[in-house]
Every structure is written in C-alpha cells, then in structure tokens.
Amino acid sequence: MLKIKNKLGIIVNARYKILDLSYIDEIMRLQDNIMEQLEDKQLYAPTEREEFISYLKDGGKIIGYVDEKNELIAMAVYIKKGYEEGNYGYDLDLEGEKLLEVAQVESTVVRSDYRGNGLQRILCEKIEDIAKSEGVKILASTASPYNKYSVNTFIKLGYEIKKDKLKYGGLRRYVLAKEI
C-alpha cells in the first residue's frame, strides 16, 4: 500500500497491481483521460487498444496503481520486442542477438490529480525489477524532449539520452537507455 496525495490534498491509499486483460477498458480510459487533458498533444503518443492487448498476450506486463475505489490512477507498460522493428535497440544501433537483451518502458501515464507523487518513478523502478528478473541487460524508453517531467524522471533513474529523432509519425523523441 502506498500513501499518496490527490490534487485536493487528501491522503489516498494506492495499491500496486499487475494488470491483465480484464483491465483493458480502464487502461484505455486512463490513456484517453491523459490525452484529453494534454494541451500539447505531441507530448504523448497514445497506444492503440489492440497494441495493449498484444503486449499482454505476448509476454509483456502492464503494471499500475489503483485508488481506494479501485480506479486505475497510473500505469506503465513493459515489453520485450525481440527482433520486431519497434525494438528501441534498433534506435541504439544494436544488431543481432544484442536486440534480445533490450526491454522497454513502452508507456507510463499518471492521472493528473495524482501527479507529483513520484508514481512514474516508482512504476519505472518496478519495471526495472521485472527486467532484471528476466535477464535483460538494457532498458530503453522514449520521451518527448518537451516533457521535462518524464525526461527528468528517466535521467534521475540513471537513463541517458542516446538519440534525438523523429518517431511515431513525425514526433520528436529522445531515445533513453540504461544498462541494468
């Protein structure tokens, strides 16, 4: 149990959950909520429902926190993409079996009324634990250079900015990576 404050200053007990397909509607609702509230839409590249489903079916993990009403307030996606073109290892100029050593933090979102509690950092630390348990050597992610909060969270966690490039249909992104 994690004690956090919502934007009204009320202390809330948040519970860590490993999410499964039964949470797909809540996952989409949380992501839609984030997108609606973003003034600058280029800060976040949304994931399609089918992608979330395939991540769960293909060995990925979606983890998150729920509030006392069991509503999803934050989530993060962990996935290993192997030789698939979406593997950030390609962005890091890795080849061959080195690509199999890469896992990624595919998405992290925190509901606006719970920001400022370090939930993104906590979820990324939990993903790092998952990655270590699976023998992953490199953890990678992307973040908009204009999203200073996400970039700073990754930097504080020991990630380095490895590339600055256009991804996701022309959005500028830092590719960040960390050896674990």
Give short role names for the model-derived ranges:
Residues 121, 133, 145-163:
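Conserved active-site alpha-helix within GNAT-family acetyltransferase domains
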Residues 115, 141-151, 169:
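Conserved beta-strand-loop-alpha-helix junction that forms the acyl-donor binding cleft
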Residues 131-143:
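Conserved GNAT acetyl-CoA-binding A-motif
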Residues 41-68, 77:
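Active-site rim helix/loop that mediates acceptor-substrate recognition in acyltransferases
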